[in-house]
Amino acid sequence: MSRKQLALFEPTLVVQALKEAVKKLNPQAQWRNPVMFIVWIGSLLTTCISIAMASGAMPGNALFSAAISGWLWVTVLFANFAEALAEGRSKAQANSLKGVKKTAFARKLREPKYGAAADKVPADQLRKGDIVLVEAGDIIPCDGEVIEGGASVDESAITGESAPVIRESGGDFASVTGGTRILSDWLVIECSVNPGETFLDRMIAMVEGAQRRKTPNEIALTILLIALTIVFLLATATLWPFSAWGGNAVSVTVLVALLVCLIPTTIGGLLSAIGVAGMSRMLGANVIATSGRAVEAAGDVDVLLLDKTGTITLGNRQASEFIPAQGVDEKTLADAAQLASLADETPEGRSIVILAKQRFNLRERDVQSLHATFVPFTAQSRMSGINIDNRMIRKGSVDAIRRHVEANGGHFPADVDQKVDQVARQGATPLVVVEGSRVLGVIALKDIVKGGIKERFAQLRKMDIKTVMITGDNRLTAAAIAAEAGVDDFLAEATPEAKLALIRQYQAESRLVAMTGDGTNDAPALAQADVAVAMNSGTQAAKEAGNMVALDSNPTKLIEVVHIGKQMLMTRGSLTTFSIANDVAKYFAIIPAAFAATYPQLNALNIMRLHSPDSAILSAVIFNALIIVFLIPLALKGVSYKPLTASAMLRRNLWIYGLGGLLVPFIGIKVIDLLLTVCGLV
């Protein structure tokens, strides 16, 4: 789900942005943007010259100089407005998040258990390690981990999803977020952060972007723009002595106008807005990025590691068949499989219990009355089970059970290997059940590949992005699902260590890797990946290791994140191309007008046949200001994005924004010149 999008020019935001644009006229704010700082200095200088001319202290056309000065100030204001509007949209999103924060009291427990004595304290005084009790109707006062209990939680204020989620102690669903509301039951929570450090606080700070740091590409582009500005500044400075030597010195006002039209003011004025808008579009997709660097890295990603369950498949694997080993009847296998799954609360575990009940009327046993020891699943052991009445029953992956059988002096039957291969080739996941060292048979778990996912992977392939499916299934099952889904590669029987090693392998080949994760065991790989999208429903460790958080915990958001990142880079590149290309038309407008009196041969460059030198210069300056406003929607929304290879994308952008950048100014400056002439303003 995506959040409700603000209108591009929301009236209240526009009014606020106009006020902020005026406030940003102070030198301290302008200094942060070197290109626009030069325009600001030029505006100040021409204003002083206009006043001097009007008072008679300097010779010259005061009205013309004032017009140039006015439009230079408008140029600065438009650039400020673009940045302020982008920031205003982000702050509006942040304000919606601030509404989630409520001044509340918390019940701080004196002992870490339900029923212990509690003290009522303000929620903002809770510290890391404090234990609190929340019950139905309460707002969770802090980020933390559930240490006891289970409850239905409404997280819509943060995720935008209306469906409640279950939070309970143990496993990967123990993490809770401050500001969410308990709908039923109760939870005992251990606070994991101090005041001001909650996930909501960090979300608000990131969205507001008050301290937004420039990304590496943004810094590199800024350096390029500064270099171009210095070159044009030096070139303009040398033109005055040339014109003076020719006997007709060009005025300082004209030189300032020439400089402003030569330097890349269009991209200089929109650069900050593009960066802020990229972060804002991420939030619109229900993804919080910790920095602009993360969004930018998403645009450069060329390897996607995608979890099979929930991303490629629907993620609701269900037990579909019991396949007994030779000499074992199906009911015996079903009984053992059900016993091994009684404490397994995963959808797969519950489906095994239900299938045994449906096939053989095997009722669920009372867990407490069994006096059994349950063995939980771990990423290392890759199996789970039960120890009961001297019986040791396990279910798990083929390799894990094979090692278990051999460690207990048994032999893995060849007929079970054949059954495992048969299940795997059908795209189902085989789970093997063993009692002691005797293999009882195979459980087939069937999942379904999501509709349309193959076409999405084909689009990613067009963009030269490699897709890798990560799964705990064996190689045969993984290969069958990978072929059906259309991924480029897969990692079967994946462990946390294997995922980490795979990421490092791709990074050693100078590739940028993106992945998703939600569990504590995903944290090392998330920390290593260049773009790491943690699920909001995941553990605190996973969210801290990632550089993005999918608020609605949808793992397919990784593909959307890459699209948004690429769109931001394309927008920046396209507008840079347009900005530099449209300078060419300004050369043909201003240079003949400024120097034709000194060097009549330059009249040959007046291919637009502009009315007069004054109208030519003023038209170019006006166009230079107005083009910033016309490009603000493009900077905020991003350029139209299509899945293409890098070379095809470059050709497309050169045609649209390079050629467009050449033609639009010729038309625009000529139209403005005609209007000025018709209205008798020059």
Swiss-Prot record:
> Is-annotated flag, keyword Disulfide bond?
no
Source organism of the structure? Shigella boydii serotype 18 (strain CDC 3083-94 / BS512)
Name the positions where ATP binds: 344, 348, 377-384, 395
Membrane-spanning intervals of the chain: 34-54, 62-82, 219-239, 254-274, 588-608, 616-636, 656-676
- The catalytic site is made up of 307 (4-aspartylphosphate intermediate)
Q: Which residues form the signal peptide?
A: none
What Gene Ontology terms describe where this protein resides (cellular component)? Answer: plasma membrane
Q: Is Cell cycle among this UniProt entry's keywords? A: no
Q: Keyword annotations for this protein?
A: ATP-binding, Cell inner membrane, Cell membrane, Ion transport, Magnesium, Membrane, Metal-binding, Nucleotide-binding, Phosphoprotein, Potassium, Potassium transport, Translocase, Transmembrane, Transmembrane helix, Transport
| Role description | Part of the high-affinity ATP-driven potassium transport (or Kdp) system, which catalyzes the hydrolysis of ATP coupled with the electrogenic transport of potassium into the cytoplasm. This subunit is responsible for energy coupling to the transport system and for the release of the potassium ions to the cytoplasm.
Assembly and partners are described as:
The system is composed of three essential subunits: KdpA, KdpB and KdpC.
| Protein name in the entry | Potassium-transporting ATPase ATP-binding subunit
Q: Which family does it belong to?
A: Belongs to the cation transport ATPase (P-type) (TC 3.A.3) family. Type IA subfamily.
- Gene3D superfamilies noted in UniProt: Calcium-transporting ATPase, cytoplasmic domain N, Calcium-transporting ATPase, cytoplasmic transduction domain A, HAD superfamily/HAD-like
Membrane-topology descriptor: Multi-pass membrane protein
Any one Gene Ontology MF annotation carried by this entry is: magnesium ion binding
**What Enzyme Commission number does this protein have?**
7.2.2.6
